[in-house]
Design a protein with these regions (language model features):
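Periplasmic OmpA-like peptidoglycan-binding domain that tethers envelope proteins to the cell wall
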Residues: 4-16, 20, 24, 28-31, ...
Length: 130
């Protein structure tokens, strides 16, 4: 999901995508959801960010993840206990930050759907041995 530089507001395109993802999340109630926010490597504009209490890209990435969590809860009724938000700052790029297109790709949120620990342990027990 793309964001404007320095922003954690969810854009219209991302809202459409979240609608589809929410349906999947609601269908698989036995799974937890990890939401990771990411940024490009552009330093935060200190003056504008200070008004929003954003100190750096770590803060911004966490706010991006948190905005998705709140959107899923408020618009689709996803249970908060199933959601975890985290920020990765600028340290998990998927593209080069040397171009504007690359920076846009790095301003994103990743959504990872995982089985709960007991389900994961069941999968391990069922795995074939070598």
């Amino acid at each position: 999901m793309l964001y404007k530089s320095g922003s954690y507001e969810i854009n219209d395109r991302a809202q459409e995508t979240l609608s589809k993802i929410a349906k999947i999340i609601m269908d698989y109630k036995d799974y937890d959801v990890l939401i990771e926010g990411n940024t490009d490597n552009v330093p935060i504009n200190t003056e504008a960010a200070t008004m929003k209490n954003i100190r750096n890209n770590w803060d911004l990435s966490a706010l991006r993840a948190s905005s998705v969590v709140h959107y899923l809860i408020n618009h689709f009724g996803v249970e908060p206990k199933r959601l975890t938000a985290g920020g990765r700052g600028e340290f998990n790029p998927v593209a080069s930050n040397d171009t504007e297109v690359g920076k846009q790709r790095n301003r994103r949120t990743q959504i990872i759907i995982t089985p709960k620990l007991d389900q994961f342990m069941d999968l391990i027990d069922k795995a074939p041995e070598e």
